[in-house]
Amino acid sequence: MSKFWNERVKKLEPYVPGEQPKDQKYIKLNTNENPYPPSPMVIEAIKKEADYKLKLYPDPNCDSLKRTIAEYYGISDKEVFVGNGSDEVLAFSFMTFFSPRKTVFFADITYSFYKVYANLLNLNCELIPLKEDFSLDLDNFCRCNGGVIIPNPNAPTAKYIGLSDIKKILDWNKDSVVIIDEAYIDFGGESAVKFIKDYKNLLIVQTLSKSRSLAGLRIGFAMGSPELIEGLSRVKNSINSYTLDRLAIVGAEAAFKDKEYFEDARRKIIATRERVSTELKQIGFKVIESKANFIFISHTTISAESIFNELRKRGILVRYFKTARIDNFLRVSIGTDKEMSEFMDKIKECIA
């Protein structure tokens, strides 16, 4: 620990991302990346942009991308904010809407970056326990608070919350911002974007990393009332005006425009997820119902840590969380049909 660090930094427990191996000998099912490449339209748009214009700064407001997103979701471009991945958008959201004076609510089993942001910003947070089946304890989110954040579907459990429950939380929390983190919404869920017009306190955060195969470009966005978007812009422009580079902007626009490619990749991932879930249940695994591009699984007799280690020896990377209540579960990203068939072969070896 350095003597040059300030007291806040000394107390930080930073987020630990999933392993990114430097070689290619593994089948990577540990970071929820899309197994299919980006749309050819994305690659073509990036190639076209990669010319003399790179000497110029990008549009700090990303107006063309905002218009593209707004048109796609049927909202105004004044209701769209874009940033360098949804993690940055979430960080800006914590800075903008949450205060140390009031307690922020999120689940005890959820995306672990939320707690990191809260600690970094010295926020008070209450971790609300999920029920035994990992469903949301709805009533506990309907109490006096300084803000709510819920991923839908949840990570790492893959549990989905219906829009009627989202609406109940919004109705109760009209004086605080409710953030719905929809990183995985495109794999079987329904977005809460239609509630934006009626709930000025609703902020929806999404990413192009998962369903649009652009994890390497770092593109995230938020949708909400113009007053929420203005607040985010004020924070962004107090830190970094140019959060998206030229290649990311044109790549993101192209990804939204190629709807056919998006739908095809999405359908394949959902079909593979359902096949693998069924096969895992047949060999003794508990599989939490998923609306994401990953599944959350536990074997009835063999420990998750043991299976994790055995899979790694066999060239398969999955995610294991040594955390209370979920330390006997594995999170498995959905790969291609071929990758998941190999995963099934290897996991059968692990439990034989």
Curated annotation (Swiss-Prot):
Q: What is this protein called?
A: Histidinol-phosphate aminotransferase
Cofactor names: pyridoxal 5'-phosphate
What SUPFAM superfamilies does its record include? PLP-dependent transferases (SSF53383)
Instruction: Give the family this protein belongs to, as stated in its UniProt record.
Output: Belongs to the class-II pyridoxal-phosphate-dependent aminotransferase family. Histidinol-phosphate aminotransferase subfamily.
Species this protein is from: Clostridium acetobutylicum (strain ATCC 824 / DSM 792 / JCM 1419 / IAM 19013 / LMG 5710 / NBRC 13948 / NRRL B-527 / VKM B-1787 / 2291 / W)
List, in alphabetical order, the GO biological process terms annotated in this UniProt record.
L-histidine biosynthetic process
Q: Which UniProt keywords apply?
A: Amino-acid biosynthesis, Aminotransferase, Histidine biosynthesis, Pyridoxal phosphate, Transferase
Q: Which Pfam families match?
A: Aminotran_1_2
> What GO MF terms are annotated?
histidinol-phosphate transaminase activity; pyridoxal phosphate binding
Its subunit composition reads: Homodimer.
Q: What class of enzyme is it?
A: transferase
Q: Which residues carry this modification: N6-(pyridoxal phosphate)lysine?
A: K210
Write down the InterPro entries for this protein, in alphabetical order: Aminotrans_II_pyridoxalP_BS, Aminotransferase_I/II_large, HisP_aminotrans, HistidinolP_aminotransfase, PyrdxlP-dep_Trfase, PyrdxlP-dep_Trfase_major, PyrdxlP-dep_Trfase_small
Which pathway does this polypeptide act in?
A: Amino-acid biosynthesis; L-histidine biosynthesis; L-histidine from 5-phospho-alpha-D-ribose 1-diphosphate: step 7/9
E.C. numbers: 2.6.1.9
Catalytic reactions of this protein: L-histidinol phosphate + 2-oxoglutarate = 3-(imidazol-4-yl)-2-oxopropyl phosphate + L-glutamate
